[in-house]
Amino acid sequence: MLLLAPQMLSLLLLALPVLASPAYVAPAPGQALQQTGIVGGQEAPRSKWPWQVSLRVRGPYWMHFCGGSLIHPQWVLTAAHCVEPDIKDLAALRVQLREQHLYYQDQLLPVSRIIVHPQFYIIQTGADIALLELEEPVNISSHIHTVTLPPASETFPPGMPCWVTGWGDVDNNVHLPPPYPLKEVEVPVVENHLCNAEYHTGLHTGHSFQIVRDDMLCAGSENHDSCQGDSGGPLVCKVNGT
């Protein structure tokens, strides 16, 4: 992940949206324009993570810039800062469903609508969540299907093993090399008050200032975390066998 205190735990900071889904990643404070990817993981098996999507922006080519999760045949969940305020033209945005290697077999899908949480302003204030409506529903299969969202009452105890996936950097300033495989890494849930204390290390905000808010969830461990390239992507945890 993004390190504010390299000698401490590197913590994956996620916001728990109103939908009660821990399904996207937010960068650390002070790094709002940097996305996050995977460090310390391995290539994901082709049979896993069928809800993973890649968000693409138009340029010299359709460049990957954020991750997301398919939560319905026609809806993708991602981070608000991935699309707000930079994405003004829907024609410049595409969604690529689960693929093992970026760019090799693209079938880019157009987006018809972006819904950003009305309370989102900047990452540090929380509510960093957005929904993308696809122009057409996708065909659900064993290779492509939705992730299960937890109920609002679900809790994620400290130490609970979860997984982060994406196509981001594999280390600080080290880009994912060709053929750009989807990566995965297992990370434990970290208590919010510990996470908040770690994020204050080296800052001058005072400990009364809450960096990790109540609508956020922390997960991560030393050398196993996220890095630049996949903000908005999923954090998934196995609960009751699902």
From Swiss-Prot:
GO cellular component: a single term: extracellular space
Tissue spec: Expressed in colon, lung, heart and synovial tissue. May be specific to mast cells.
GO molecular function: serine-type endopeptidase activity; serine-type peptidase activity
Residue ranges occupied by any Peptidase S1 domain in the UniProt entry: 38-242
Catalytic EC class: hydrolase
Pfam families found in the cross-reference section: Trypsin (PF00089)
Signal peptide (from-to): 1-25
Annotated catalysed reactions: Preferential cleavage: Arg-|-Xaa, Lys-|-Xaa, but with more restricted specificity than trypsin
Primary location recorded for the protein, binned into one broad class: secreted
Subunit structure: Homotetramer.
Protein name listed in UniProt: Tryptase delta
Gene source species: Homo sapiens (Human)
High-level lineage: Eukaryota, Metazoa, Chordata, Craniata, Vertebrata
